Amino acid sequence: MSLHDPASLRTARLWRPRRVVVTAAARDHAHGRAILARAEALGLPVEALPGNRLTGLRHPDPRRAYIEAKSTLAVVVAPPAKLKLQPIPPSADWRVDLAEGCPAHCQYCYLAGSLAGPPVTRVYANLPEILSNLASYVGRGGVTSASAERAQEGTSFEASCYTDPLGIEHLSGSLSAAIRHFGAWDAPVSLRATTKFAAVEPLLGLDHGRRTRLRFSVNPVAAGRFEGGTAPLRERLSALGAVARAGYPVGLTVAPILPLPDWRAAYDDLFVQAAEALAGAPDLDLTAELITHRFTPGSKTVLEGWYPGSDLPMREDERSRKFTKFGSVKYVFPAELMREMRGELTRSLAERLPMARVLYWTRGGSLTRLPRTPPPGPGSIPPGNPRRRPAGCGRPWRSGRPGGKSSPRRSAASAGRARPGSRGPSPAGS
């Protein structure tokens, strides 16, 4: 079956949480009630909480706590801190959170080192407030807003830092609402989202105005064993082709890059398959982001608790030890291997997908931009009059404490949330 045959859009089973809880405050919002209605229509058990605290999330066994949390969808109101946007280079000017948490079971998940508490998926009921808040950030970013190579993206907003929005779209409807919001927004702005899922049918007919770039997080087939609960690679690539033919700017987030057996041929084949999926897409606007695997001592501890017996390569003696600007430790691939992987992947990508603009290559947190100035085209943001960018464009980042415990004074509702002011992980799926 061809990757751009409509029949190939039949995707893996959608996530069905075993427990859906909705707080009292969330029920006061129309978007929250709509999420509740979708869950009930699917026959999911829904629990209306009397207050705004999430309960029953803790368990003395970390593995059991993980299983229970990963089976729970919580409909809550985003806290005020979510309306104070943080920069998220190298992806975008600003991070906007439509939700927090992910239903997938990726054994390298970076949320393991970025969120405290059980990994419950929270979706925010006050979506109109979140979207209306974005206007005050236009023209103030330091990534695309300040880049000659990416200026056509306008002020960019990344929606995949702490979630995979497509993985919960059948329940939340939040990604569709955000796409429509940006499509109707007459300003130099763009929305970015990354996914490891493939259920794109609800997005294909939206009036997106080419202001949303949908990227698909991909890796060779051999890496699929580390990505439980996600759509198979073939389905993701089919979905990539479908949204490209629906006029969306698209992208490949190649992450996390791993030197698996026969990795050179495997990544080359990945790009061949992507080229097949995109064949015939009109006015194609394609980017690529290349992100290598890294881990911290804290995230490794959390992941080993979540996925005992995983054979994901995380041996410190096979890595280089690096320090972040905050003084924390991370383990990345040795420099020689890093250079070899970068050379092979960028060469293969240029050969198989010459139309792709490679935005950057990350080596475990360090960034190498691979600029290829894009020609003006249909993917460009319509001209506008962005506000003058002030001298400062966000608070300094503070590193979260990977795998740290919550303070006993924190409410149960805050368990699992991103630590305020933290940079957060790479976009979801990376």
Predicted regions and their residues:
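Glycine-rich S-adenosyl-L-methionine
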Residues: T230-V243
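Conserved Radical SAM active-site core
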Residues: V76-I88, L111-R215
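Conserved radical SAM core fold
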Residues: A159-I168, A198-E201, T212-T230, P256-P261, ...
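Auxiliary Fe-S-binding modules of radical SAM enzymes
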Residues: M1-G32, A275-S430
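Flexible, acidic/Gly-rich N-terminal and inter-domain linker regions that tether
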Residues: M1-A92
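A conserved active-site cap/scaffold subdomain adjacent to cofactor or substrate pockets
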Residues: A244-V254
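Catalytic cores of alpha/beta
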Residues: D262-E276
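Local cysteine-cluster metal-coordination motifs and their immediate loop/turn environment
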Residues: D97-S114
